[in-house]
């Protein structure tokens, strides 16, 4: 079953969600010989936000749901190249230290992916995302963001490797009269799995993000840069030929000026 990639963050808990940390097993194992088809994916993340790197945390916990529709299509002039376009809608709920909570729609995303298979068991791809500030006021980043990432998958027998490296270019945010320059993000993610028998395909993960410093454009105050590295463990389930699921636990092991990752991820993918 082909995997599909996505990334999503939101303002109140952005620091606790590493970009592309939602990638699971076979995420970038994409076909090049196919008739057009569709995939629905649901990514669900619960994070304990009570701890932070290098300072107090402002939250208790957060729940993020990312729902994506992806359409695979072909270009006749490029028979050995695969393409898909994708749309993401979702919601977030964040509980703060004072027991107040905010919830609503995250900023929608639209994207496109193109890929080739240099070898029968090796995929390389490029993905572009546009983030538009149409989410609810207390959830939105209030900025137009763009990201681009290199993606790869390699399989050898029961062994599967997925990885990516990318950059997210974050626009200036405008909210409640405050204009803020936000630092860009660099990120990388690795996933390594081994299939013993059907539905027993454990995997380990390594996720990393580094955010550049920003600035309050009104006061001139600097917003500190931040970074985090997290590791995870989970299992991939091939439930049917059209339905798959991944579940894993991800925990931050090093970081700075950031909410500590302490999260459970659950992913479903359905082909139709």
Regions found by a protein language model. Give the residues of each.
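Short proline/glycine-enriched turn/loop segments at secondary-structure junctions
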Residues: 254-257
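Active-site glycine- and acidic-residue-rich loops that bind
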Residues: 139-143, 178-187
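Transmembrane beta-barrel domains of Gram-negative outer membranes and organellar outer membranes
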Residues: 14-132, 146-170, 185-187, 191, ...
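Surface-exposed cleft-lining segments at the edges of enzyme active sites
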Residues: 131-139, 168-179
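C-terminal segment of classical bacterial N-terminal signal peptides
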Residues: 2-12
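Outer-membrane beta-barrel and related beta-rich outer-membrane complex signature
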Residues: 54, 138, 175, 216, ...
């Amino acid at each position: 079953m082909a995997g599909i990639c996505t990334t999503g963050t939101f303002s109140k808990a952005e620091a606790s969600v590493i970009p592309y940390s939602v990638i699971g097993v076979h995420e970038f194992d994409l076909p090049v010989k196919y008739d057009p088809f569709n995939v629905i994916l649901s990514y669900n993340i619960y994070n304990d936000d009570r701890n932070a790197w290098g300072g107090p945390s402002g939250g208790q916990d957060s729940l993020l749901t990312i729902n994506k529709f992806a359409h695979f299509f072909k270009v006749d002039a490029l028979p050995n190249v695969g393409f898909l376009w994708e749309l993401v809608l979702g919601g977030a709920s964040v509980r703060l230290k004072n027991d107040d909570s905010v919830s609503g729609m995250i900023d929608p995303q639209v994207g496109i992916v193109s890929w080739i298979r240099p070898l029968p068991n090796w995929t390389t791809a490029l993905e572009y995302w546009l983030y538009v500030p149409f989410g609810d006021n207390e959830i939105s980043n209030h900025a137009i963001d763009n990201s681009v990432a290199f993606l790869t998958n390699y399989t050898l027998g029961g062994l599967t490797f997925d990885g990516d490296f990318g950059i997210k270019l974050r626009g200036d945010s405008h909210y409640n009269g405050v204009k803020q320059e936000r630092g860009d993000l660099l990120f990388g993610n690795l996933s390594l799995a081994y299939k013993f028998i059907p539905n027993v395909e454990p995997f380990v993960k390594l996720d990393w993000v580094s955010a550049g410093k920003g600035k309050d454009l009104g006061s001139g105050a600097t917003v500190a840069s931040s970074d985090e590295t997290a590791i995870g463990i989970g299992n991939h389930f091939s439930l049917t030929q059209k339905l798959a699921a991944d579940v894993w636990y991800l925990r931050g092991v090093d970081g700075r000026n950031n909410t500590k990752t302490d999260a459970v991820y659950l992913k479903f993918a359905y082909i139709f």
